[in-house]
Design a protein with these regions (language model features):
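Cytosolic regulatory regions of ion transport systems
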Residues: 1-456
């Protein structure tokens, strides 16, 4: 597909890499010449130095025959303007990143009036992810499928769980838990395990289950399941605002530390149920004096990654509460993984995942479309949910007879109100939603799960 990408910052760079690696013809537009040169030298993309809201620049980029137009500059208004002009000049699908909370209640109206196909608000998405984690604090990461009915949950395995030396196939009978272990991170590597795989303390385990079954499993392995009742947030930006709104609706006590007095006034007006503290969040004495040690959740949401990391390490030393750390830069995730920062949330990853998911779905003319896509375990594993629209080589055949690709696990089938952890005799049917976890990147369709070389 021909894709025009306006904005070559962190998100734009990640998208340029991902989309070009998937074989798309990508043209990047940015006003910064050095940034454009870096992208064209680093990835298989074309680059144009110019303003994405200029008709001349759009024409030079080939807007007339573009399939997808993506605007991820640092300005919401510019992103919307770019998409509006692109819609007028071409006939492509438009995707805009819009972050300002003042637009949050107007997104549907904006999409309809401007003709944008999709709007992504990474701060709102990050707040929802953090809210899920605070409702299920034993997990370090939670992703949802099947309209929220199925969850992919990650946790760190310690001696307290009593699973050291246990084979995965033993879990259902030993713990009477209907869950499926989908991936294990060990010693820097990632494994898609089979039933004979033996767990070890120190593993990062990702499993799939319904919310009810996940709750039961965590109780049986002595991980906390009670939602937090109070949260201590450092940083009063957009994520803190969205998160606090959701927490207050669920009767969670919220304290926000923000150093900017003007921003404190805004938050006090917008969040009358929260306690707003005007102070430098890096003031350790202040944090301790305000009861950080007794908080059930500590969430570091400043705009500086290094400050968030240090704050979380300090909180880890003094508090037993749930820890959540926001990180913007994508390039240091492998280093951060060794620091045990609790749950690390990357808003920019969420933006990329959503857009890549949308582009892959557009690429399918018919058949099985991607409904949901997550890249997990430091971007090394993809978890995808496909909707089955028509018969194919993957349907109507017992799963035990399907030749699946290596390092791929078919985890779940949802059929109407049924949620199935599939067995060898089960079959995929038209109308099903199918969830797979794989080390292979770039799957576009359910048929891509089959190892065509092994057939026949």
């Amino acid at each position: 597909m021909k894709i025009i990408l306006v904005g070559g910052g962190k998100v734009g760079t990640a998208l340029a890499r991902q989309l070009s690696e998937e074989g798309h013809n990508v043209t990047v537009v940015d006003t910064n010449k050095a940034r454009v040169e870096h992208l064209t030298e680093s990835y298989d993309v074309l680059g144009i130095v110019g303003n994405g809201s200029s008709i001349t620049t759009l024409s030079e980029a080939g807007i007339e025959d573009a399939d997808v137009f993506i605007a991820v500059t640092g300005s919401d208004e510019l992103n919307l303007l770019c998409c509006m002009f692109a819609k007028k000049a071409g006939h492509c699908h438009g995707i805009a990143r819009v972050r300002n909370p003042s637009y949050s209640h107007e997104l549907d109206f904006i999409k309809k009036q401007i003709g944008i196909s999709a709007i992504i608000n990474p701060e709102m998405a990050a707040a929802k992810e953090i809210s899920h984690l605070l409702r299920f604090p034993g997990a370090s990461k939670i992703d949802t499928f099947a309209d929220g009915r199925v969850r992919l949950i990650k946790f760190a395995l310690t001696a307290e769980q009593g699973l050291d030396g246990v084979a995965i196939r033993e879990i259902p009978t030993r713990l009477k838990s209907d869950i499926l272990v989908c991936a294990v991170e060990r010693s820097g590597g990632v494994i898609i395990p089979n039933g004979n795989f033996v767990l070890q303390n120190g593993d990062q385990v990702t499993f799939l289950a319904t919310q009810e079954k996940a709750h039961e499993f965590f109780q049986r392995i002595h991980l906390p399941v009670r939602p937090v009742r109070n949260a201590f947030i450092v940083g009063g930006g957009a994520i803190a605002f969205y998160l606090s709104q959701e927490l207050l609706e669920n009767h969670v006590r919220v304290r926000i530390v923000e150093r900017d007095p003007a921003r404190c006034m805004e938050l006090a007006e917008q969040l009358p149920g929260a306690q707003i503290l005007n102070e430098d969040g890096s003031n350790r004495e202040f944090l301790l004096s305000e009861g950080m040690e007794s908080t059930e959740a500590f969430v570091a949401l400043t705009n500086i990654d290094e400050e968030n990391v240090l704050l979380t390490l300090f909180a880890k030393k003094h508090s037993k509460g749930k820890l959540v750390t926001k990180v913007n830069r994508l390039e240091f995730d492998d280093i951060l993984a060794g620091l045990d920062l609790g749950s690390v949330v990357y808003p920019k990853y969420m933006t990329c995942d959503y857009i890549v998911q949308y582009v892959r779905a557009l690429q399918n003319e018919a058949g099985s479309n991607i409904k949901t896509l997550y890249r997990i375990l430091d971007d090394r594993v993809e978890a995808l949910e496909f909707t089955v629209h028509e018969k194919s080589a993957a349907t109507g055949v017992p799963l035990s007879q399907l030749h699946l690709k290596k390092n791929l696990l078919l985890c779940c089938i949802t059929r109407g109100h049924q949620i199935l952890i599939p067995r060898g005799g089960d079959q995929i049917q038209v109308g099903d939603n199918v969830i797979v976890v794989t080390l292979e990147h770039g799957l576009h369709d359910l048929r891509d799960i089959l190892d065509k070389g092994a057939e026949g």
